């Protein structure tokens, strides 16, 4: 874990080294100053030597200035190093997520990834800053002060050496108990973020069903869980200060009493006693500082582990050692394919799929919810890998192709239509960043999106809000289809992508496809048989298996499921189940 985190320091190694170096210099200056102060008292004030007081005082001022400068530099370098580490961690995690397959992403919830990219990275950033500065300052202060104290008077120094040992053990017990609650806190942050994300993204549904009180209650519960665990940890940590104060005051009283006796006996000077008291405070405060460092590091350890889970996750889908960069045509073949989302699944989602589609064919796919329609087409663009068998595109196993090449040639319009913040033109150019305005207009004409775009005041420069909330569901679908067409793919997959448009527009889109992109192999998943009945062939899916495959007329004669649904839809009745992932 430590190696993974530190590997992201990269260009900030120099400032990461300079931070503790400057801090060590500051501590050395601070530890020498009490010795000079003792000299002023014993050799200057007591002896009435004004010259000694002036010279030593100037040296003290110089050392204080050096200490201050080194402290400022240490803080500056530490801020650069910790902020740089946080930046690199966020970039590394985000870039790693971009390489994940769908199966990798299934292991992390959206809210969990957001927490890791924000709260967890901030915790590690703060801990790194503290480690660079305070983890240098506290041990160095304790060590130097202890050595100097024993050099002055070993018997008095042993008093707070014993106090340090006792206090250290007590603080360790406190920190160990508090750590358990901090680990739980960060797990509960995921629940809080999930509640916020779901509520904001689904606010229209919440209001439509008057579920504001329920959602508010759910959020309050998540917030209360975090509060309760933080409070439990803080109750334990609240013992830190009383124990610290008791130890400090007890040590000062004991050292003062013993020191006074030593002064009377002539074995200790007043300046040396002041030094000992100063070093006593420095040692005990350093111990308190270490206890706070322990808390911060303990909290950040939980965050660091969660960050490393993302960075150490290996993508399930990778390019072959010698990838193929050319796909000759849009033919697609499934050879006895089995597929499951998890390796430990009791039964596969797809079972023994054997299917051959020639280039330029239009294939309709229908089936009820859970029949694995989407799972089937996801294998063509290698969003997932098969569990058994082979999927071939252009006569080659999809695992032989360069992933970017494959996905550029197999364009998918997913069930969930997603648009991004930006203009319509910017969204369209996700399909081809170099597409001209004329090419974008042609794609929109094929998708019947030009009809509403031209009515907008700003046309193709109309700004799309986050998630496409300022356009209708049907308009989002048509823009997503146009975006996919700009890739000029050899294979086009429409996953129930016209469900929100009216039947007339649906028919216009299908006619445009037939006339304008006849050389593209098309897979059209639909709930309405009218959307696929003109396809070259229609695939009927049922519980992860092929129930029927043929033309509309053939299926009406041979497939009971197809017959039943066709008759029902023709008579204005039922439909395949809608809304689920097929």
Could you tell me what each predicted segment is?
Residues 1-33, 37, 45-59, 73-78, ...:
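Membrane-integrated ABC transporters
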Residues 11, 15-28, 60-63, 69, ...:
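Transmembrane helices of ABC transporter permease
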Residues 11-14, 99-103, 119-132, 136, ...:
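An intracellular "coupling" helix at the cytosolic face of ABC transporter transmembrane type-1 domains
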Residues 20, 24-32, 65-72, 124-127, ...:
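Hydrophobic alpha-helical transmembrane bundles that constitute the permease/transmembrane domains
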Residues 21-22, 29-42, 63-110, 114, ...:
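Juxtamembrane helix-loop junctions of ABC transporter transmembrane domains
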Residues 47-48, 83, 91-115, 119-121, ...:
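Short intracellular "coupling" helices and adjacent cytoplasmic loop segments at the cytosolic face
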Residues 49-53, 144, 148-163, 232-306, ...:
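Helix-loop-helix
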Residues 325-582:
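ABC-type nucleotide-binding domain
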């Amino acid at each position: 874990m430590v190696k993974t985190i530190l590997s992201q320091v990269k260009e900030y190694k120099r400032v990461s080294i300079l931070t503790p170096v400057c801090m060590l210099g500051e501590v050395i200056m601070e530890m020498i100053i009490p010795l000079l102060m003792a000299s002023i008292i014993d050799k200057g004030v007591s002896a009435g030597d004004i010259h000694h007081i002036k010279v030593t005082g100037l040296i003290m001022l110089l050392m204080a200035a050096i200490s201050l400068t080194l402290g400022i530099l240490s803080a500056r370098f530490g801020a650069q190093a910790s902020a740089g580490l946080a930046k690199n961690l966020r970039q590394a995690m985000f870039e790693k997520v971009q390489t994940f397959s769908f199966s990798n992403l299934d292991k992390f919830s959206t809210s969990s990834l957001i927490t890791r990219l924000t709260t967890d990275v901030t915790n590690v950033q703060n801990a790194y800053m503290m480690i660079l500065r305070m983890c240098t300052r506290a041990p160095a202060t304790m060590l130097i002060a202890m050595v100097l104290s024993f050099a002055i008077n070993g018997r008095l120094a042993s008093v707070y050496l014993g106090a340090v040992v006792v206090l250290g053990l007590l603080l360790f017990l406190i920190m160990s108990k508090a750590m358990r609650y901090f680990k739980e806190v960060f797990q509960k942050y995921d629940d809080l973020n999930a509640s916020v994300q779901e509520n904001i993204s689904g606010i229209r549904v919440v209001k439509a069903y008057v579920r504001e009180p329920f959602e508010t209650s759910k959020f309050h519960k998540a917030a209360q869980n975090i509060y309760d665990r933080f409070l439990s940890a803080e109750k334990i940590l609240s013992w830190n200060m009383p124990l610290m104060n008791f130890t400090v005051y007890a040590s000062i009283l004991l050292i003062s009493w013993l020191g006074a006796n030593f002064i009377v006996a002539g074995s200790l000077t007043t300046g040396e006693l002041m030094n000992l008291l100063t070093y006593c405070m420095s040692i005990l405060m350093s111990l308190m500082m270490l206890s706070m460092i322990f808390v911060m590091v303990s909290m950040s350890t939980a965050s660091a582990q969660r960050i490393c889970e993302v960075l150490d996750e290996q993508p399930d889908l990778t390019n072959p050692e010698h990838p193929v960069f050319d796909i000759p045509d849009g033919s697609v073949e499934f050879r006895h394919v089995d597929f499951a989302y998890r390796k430990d699944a009791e039964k596969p989602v797809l079972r023994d799929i054997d299917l051959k589609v020639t280039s330029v064919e239009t294939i309709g796919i229908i089936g009820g919810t859970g029949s694995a329609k989407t799972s089937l087409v996801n294998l063509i663009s290698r969003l997932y890998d098969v569990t058994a068998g082979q999927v071939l595109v252009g006569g080659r196993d999809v695992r032989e192709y360069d992933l970017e090449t494959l996905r550029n040639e197999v364009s998918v319009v997913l069930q969930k239509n997603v648009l991004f913040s930006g203009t319509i033109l910017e969204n369209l150019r996700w399909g081809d960043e170099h597409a001209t305005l004329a090419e974008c207009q042609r794609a929109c004409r094929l998708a019947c999106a030009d009809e509403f775009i031209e009515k907008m005041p700003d046309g193709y420069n109309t700004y799309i809000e986050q998630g496409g909330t300022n356009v209708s569901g049907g308009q989002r679908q048509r823009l997503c289809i146009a975006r996919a067409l700009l890739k000029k793919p050899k294979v086009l997959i429409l996953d129930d992508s016209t469900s929100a448009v009216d039947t007339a527009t649906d028919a216009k889109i299908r006619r445009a496809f037939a006339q304008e992109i006849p050389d593209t192999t098309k897979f059209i998943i639909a709930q309405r048989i009218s959307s696929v009945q003109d396809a070259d062939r229609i695939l009927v899916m049922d519980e992860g298996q092929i129930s029927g495959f043929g033309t509309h007329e053939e299926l009406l004669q041979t497939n009971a499921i197809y017959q039943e649904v066709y008759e029902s839809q023709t008579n204005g009745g039922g439909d395949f189940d809608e809304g689920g992932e097929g």
